[in-house]
Structure formats: C-alpha cells, structure tokens
Curated annotation (Swiss-Prot):
Family statement drawn from the similarity comment of this UniProt entry: Belongs to the RuBisCO large chain family. Type I subfamily.
Coiled-coil features, chain-numbered ranges: none
Site feature location: Transition state stabilizer: 324
Protein name: Ribulose bisphosphate carboxylase large chain
Positions where N6-carboxylysine occurs in the chain: 191
One Pfam family, short name: RuBisCO_large
Function statement: RuBisCO catalyzes two reactions: the carboxylation of D-ribulose 1,5-bisphosphate, the primary event in carbon dioxide fixation, as well as the oxidative fragmentation of the pentose substrate in the photorespiration process. Both reactions occur simultaneously and in competition at the same active site.
Entry's localization field: Plastid, Chloroplast
Species of the source: Nelsonia canescens
EC number(s) reported in the record: 4.1.1.39
Post-translational modification note: The disulfide bond which can form in the large chain dimeric partners within the hexadecamer appears to be associated with oxidative stress and protein turnover.
Cofactor note: Binds 1 Mg(2+) ion per subunit.
C-alpha cells in the first residue's frame, strides 16, 4: 500500500527546530502546560498538528497531499521563567491553511479542537503574528482614527463618553433624556450598555428614535458634533443589519456591536456595512474575560484585539489600568499600540511576542471604561494619550447635581489635563494639583471631586508578565 498504519509520535513530523519561518507564515506563541510525563517537544508538536493537518493516527489519505507544504510546525520552545511545567511553544502555519478575509476561519483552526486536547493540562494562545499577505485580505476598521476625528471635528484631546445607567430598566424616553443631559453637559458620546438590545421595557426602535432626538437637540445647543453608540447587536445577523440600517436612516454617526457574543462573522459583515455607509462602529468586548482572564489557559486579549482590528471596529474597550476592571499598565499599553499603530516591534517586556506590520490597515481607538472618575483624569490622559475614548458611566451619572453637571465636570477636568500637558507639566506627579486648581472655577468639578475623593479599586492584577 505504501503507507504504514498506526499511531506515531507527533514530534517526528511536527517538531522542526531547524525550520526558518517565512514572511507569509502566520506565527503563534502558545503557553503550553503538558500533562505529567509528556515532553515539551511532543506537546508543542501536538499543538501544531491538531491545529493544522494532523490527527491522532496515520491515515492513508495523507499520501494524496503534500504534508510538508501544509502542516503547522513547532519551530521553537522556551521554558516559562518561574513556572516549572510551562513552555512557550512557537508554531508556524502556512498561509494556505486559511481562508482570505475570515477571522472566523483563522480562529477555528488555531484555537479550535486543540484546546480540548488530553495530552495538555492547559493551553493559552499568547500572541499571533499576522503576515502582511494575510492582513491585506481584510478591510479592517470601517474608518480608523483620522477619519473619525475628521467626521467629528474634534482634535488634540481624548474623546469623552458615558455609558447610560441603570443599564437595564429605563423607558426609551427617559433613556433619551439621560443621553441628552450628558451630551448637553459636554460629553462627545453616550453609550448603550452591552446588554441593552431590545427588551420588553425598551424596544430598540423606540430607543434609537429618542437617542437620535437627544443627539440633534444637544448638537444644536452646543455647536459640537455628538453621538450615541446605538447597540445593533441582535439574535440574528439579519436583525442586526436591520438595526444598523435604521440608524443610518436616522443620520446618526455611530453604531455599536458586541463582537465576541455576536461573533466574528456578524461583526465583519457589520463593519463592511459601516464603511459603505459612513457609520462609525464601536465595539464592546463582553465575554472577553471568559477567554482571557486565566493565565495558563485560553487566549490573551492582545490576540482578540488583533482579531478585532482585522474584522473591523473603530473603537474597542481596552481596560483602564486605574479603574475597577483588570489590566496591568505595560500589558495594556502593549495591546493599545497593537490597536492604534501601523508597525509594532517585538517587545517581550510588554507581552508582544512578534513584530507586527499592519501595512496601513486603519487603527482602532482604545476605550477606557469601568470605575473611573475625575480624579483618574490626569492618569488616563497620560497613559492613553489623545487617540482614546475615556468613558465615565457612574463617574458622570453619579454626580450629586445630576447628569449635565457630571458631564461638565468631566469635560473641565479633561480640558485642564490636556492644557497642563501641553504646557509641559507632569501629569503623573501634579495630577491632583491640576484637578484641584481647575475645580476652583468649576463648581461642578468641585462637587465631583468631593464625592469621589476616597474611591479606589486596588487589587493585584491577575494578568502579569512572567
């Protein structure tokens, strides 16, 4: 027959330390925890095999194709410092294994069945290098950072947002009223919470209409362009598109999608529609922590961030470093650069395993949201820079005088920080002084400073560098 039946060790075929990676290969860095007694070479080779051409036994149909051309290869293994039984296994995948322009297909291969593999105790995808040839098959974000600034006519500062709370339970009219007050008070955007879709107490069409009214009224009164992230996420792709189309008919500037719960296929369709019709697309990452919070299993958020830039979105939530949700500074800034910049050098100190060239794919604006308030403004301005959205939900709506004064307090704090930075002051060292000085001529800011002066969320980060 010319083929030898039976089970053979993966490493005989899939562990190739002499392999020179090609510019067209997709490269992956996996954190592998093998079962006791399984050598790291076998574990790394098993990952390469099960996520590409291999299966558990030799099959005669292997002879009908060129495995050498199509197989994934584990080409390097490093022990993880400080962890006795963990290894970083580097795997190279030939580009032909993947459908063009499909994040869905890429993930189905690379993070598919292999994560349930018995020979491994745990497996985490730490990073991916997307080759230029593959990047070029994606449209990417509908518009990108510069086009968004031009559409909004806002330059030289971070943008300000607010998630409307309580997230569930308001009627459409009251919801629209809260949006109007925040936008009128000085914010650039208000936002649907990720789980606001179309519930019995507030159907989507009513919400869209009242929010559009809030946008137009506040624009007329302030002379600034305003927006509300209308969440188009729905139970079916068709319904999602229907909502996006209605938003466009209302003439609003931006819609929103929950890209992990909604799925990459739906997200990419929506991103294409948004580019074709001039809508900005805000992305919420609900469900990300299910995938990325465990240190030894799952997928790091930097991979989900890269996937989103390929699939398409103009904003994405990216942690705050200082608020109530997880995120260590160096790691967060690492994937913030991966979202915004055109070319990112390998830098293991920030968790970046590969040099990534996006070849002019538009950038994504990171959104800092979750447990932040006016006292955080100097740190946020310094950490995230101008190309970011700073979102204060409770930090706006929790103001003792109401929503509009809460919005005004945030806007004054932001303008004060940007001015201080532009004058060459050190925001990290003088932040509190800058806020105090500004609050002398803004009673709204003074009241906000008083309410939140003692609030801190101080826990040790789970997602740390080794």
């Amino acid at each position: 027959v010319g083929f030898k039946a039976g089970v053979k060790e993966y490493k005989l075929t899939y562990y190739t330390p002499e392999y020179e990676t090609k510019d067209t290969d997709i490269l992956a860095a996996f954190r592998v925890t093998p079962q006791p007694g399984v050598p790291p070479e076998e574990a790394g080779a098993a990952v390469a095999a099960e996520s590409s051409t291999g299966t558990w036994t030799t099959v005669w149909t292997d002879g009908l194709t060129s495995l050498d051309r199509y197989k994934g290869r584990c080409y390097n293994i490093e022990p993880v410092p400080g962890e006795a039984d963990q290894y970083i296994c580097y795997v190279a995948y030939p580009l032909d294994l993947f459908e063009e322009g499909s994040v869905t297909n890429m993930f189905t291969s690379i993070v598919g069945n292999v994560f349930g593999f018995k020979a491994l105790r745990a497996l985490r995808l730490e990073d991916l290098r997307i080759p230029v040839a593959y990047v070029k098959t994606f449209q990417g974000p509908p518009h990108g950072i510069q086009v968004e600034r031009d559409k909004l006519n806002k330059y030289g500062r971070p943008l300000l947002g607010c998630t409307i709370k309580p997230k569930l339970g308001l009627s459409a009219k009251n919801y629209g009223r809260a949006c109007y007050e925040c936008l009128r008070g000085g914010l650039d955007f208000t936002k649907d919470d990720e789980n606001v879709n179309s519930q019995p107490f507030m159907r989507w069409r009513d919400r869209f209409l009242f929010c559009a009214e809030a946008i137009y009224k506040s624009q007329a009164e302030t002379g600034e362009i305003k927006g509300h992230y209308l969440n188009a996420t729905a139970g079916t792709c068709e319904e999602m598109m229907k909502r996006a189309i209605f938003a466009r008919e209302l003439g609003v500037p931006i819609v929103m999608h929950d890209y992990l719960t909604g799925g990459f296929t739906a997200n990419t369709s929506l991103a294409h529609y948004c580019r074709d019709n001039g809508l900005l697309l805000h992305i919420h990452r609900a469900m990300h922590a299910v995938i990325d919070r465990q240190k030894n299993h799952g997928m790091h958020f930097r991979v989900l961030a890269k996937a989103l830039r390929m699939s398409g979105g103009d904003h994405i939530h990216a942690g705050t470093v200082v608020g109530k949700l997880e995120g260590e500074r160096d790691i967060t800034l690492g994937f913030v650069d991966l979202l915004r910049d055109d070319f990112i050098e390998k830098d293991r100190s920030r968790g970046i395993y590969f040099t990534q060239d996006w070849v002019s794919l538009p950038g994504v604006i990171p959104v800092a949201s979750g447990g932040i308030h006016v006292w955080h403004m100097p740190a946020l301005t310094e950490i995230f820079g101008d190309d970011s959205v700073l979102q204060f939900g409770g930090g706006t709506l929790g103001h003792p005088w109401g929503n509009a004064p809460g919005a005004a307090a945030n806007r004054v704090a932001l303008e004060a920080c940007v001015q201080a930075r532009n004058e060459g002051r050190d925001l990290a060292a003088e932040g509190n002084t800058i806020i105090r000085e500004a609050s002398k001529w803004s009673p709204e800011l003074a009241a906000a400073c008083e309410v939140w002066k003692e609030i801190k969320f101080e826990f040790k980060a789970v997602d740390t560098l080794d």
